[in-house]
A protein has these predicted regions:
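Intrinsically disordered, low-complexity, hydrophilic segments
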Residues: 1-68
């Protein structure tokens, strides 16, 4: 599913958490994704070589932590 991570109104927080979790990412990398989850996963996969499933799992954990 192509979820827009900006709809939560927390895109800046999400970007910060993603950059902490995957230190090789830049603001430009994340801005290129336009907040689209599938694009975020793609950029992380491209930069790190992690599997999409592993990235999705970690991203879910980060998003869940932001909701608390």
């Amino acid at each position: 599913m192509d979820m827009d991570l900006r709809t939560e109104g927390r895109w800046d927080q999400v970007k910060g958490r993603v950059k902490e979790a995957w230190g090789t990412l830049t603001d430009d990398d994340l801005d290129r994704t336009e907040g689209k989850r599938d694009r975020v996963v793609g950029v992380i996969k491209e930069r790190t070589g992690e599997t999409a499933d592993a990235i999705e799992q970690k991203l879910d954990q980060l998003l869940d932590a932001l909701k608390k």
